[in-house]
């Protein structure tokens, strides 16, 4: 798999279109950090890490709906393995005039664009969520 984070985002997108309550994805630290940001921003209910066997784990993602409609309207990968996208904090555009969130990988960890502006750090723009 060349883009594990992109795979997880696609699993979330597909599960929400199919109105699933839960989706699973292979576990990694980056994926868990991105899910933590999504949970803090209110886009998912939560997630848990399940150990399948020693050394192999998966993330169980609880999706969130509002009156039967998915909370996540759009989730797209920005920086890909073939085209990395980095942004200074002053050049980071707002997603849908502040209604959406960009998730960044910064030297201080994975955080939302709001947290990055507060901490005044830029980094790699992993994805956009609306």
Curated annotation (Swiss-Prot):
Gene: rpsH
Function of the protein: One of the primary rRNA binding proteins, it binds directly to 16S rRNA central domain where it helps coordinate assembly of the platform of the 30S subunit.
Swiss-Prot/TrEMBL keywords: Ribonucleoprotein, Ribosomal protein, RNA-binding, rRNA-binding
Annotated GO biological process: translation
GO cellular component, one term: ribosome
Lineage: Bacteria, Pseudomonadati, Pseudomonadota, Alphaproteobacteria, Acetobacterales
Record's protein name: Small ribosomal subunit protein uS8
InterPro entries cross-referenced by the UniProt entry: Ribosomal_uS8, Ribosomal_uS8_CS, Ribosomal_uS8_sf
Family: Belongs to the universal ribosomal protein uS8 family.
One Pfam match: Ribosomal_S8
SUPFAM superfamilies referenced in this protein's UniProt entry, alphabetically: Ribosomal protein S8
GO MF entry, a single one: rRNA binding
Assembly behavior: Part of the 30S ribosomal subunit. Contacts proteins S5 and S12.
Organism superkingdom: Bacteria
């Amino acid at each position: 798999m060349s883009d594990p984070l992109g795979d997880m985002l696609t699993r979330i997108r597909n599960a929400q279109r199919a109105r699933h309550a839960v989706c699973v994805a292979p576990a990694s630290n980056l994926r868990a950090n991105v899910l933590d940001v999504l949970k803090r921003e209110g886009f998912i209910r939560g997630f848990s890490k399940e150990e399948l066997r020693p050394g192999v784990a998966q993330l169980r993602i609880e999706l969130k709906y509002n009156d039967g409609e998915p909370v996540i309207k759009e989730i797209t990968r920005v920086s890909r393995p073939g085209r990395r996208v980095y942004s200074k904090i002053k050049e980071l555009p707002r997603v849908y005039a502040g209604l959406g969130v960009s998730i960044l990988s910064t030297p201080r960890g994975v955080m939302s664009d709001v947290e990055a502006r507060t901490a005044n750090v830029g980094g790699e723009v992993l994805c956009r969520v609306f």
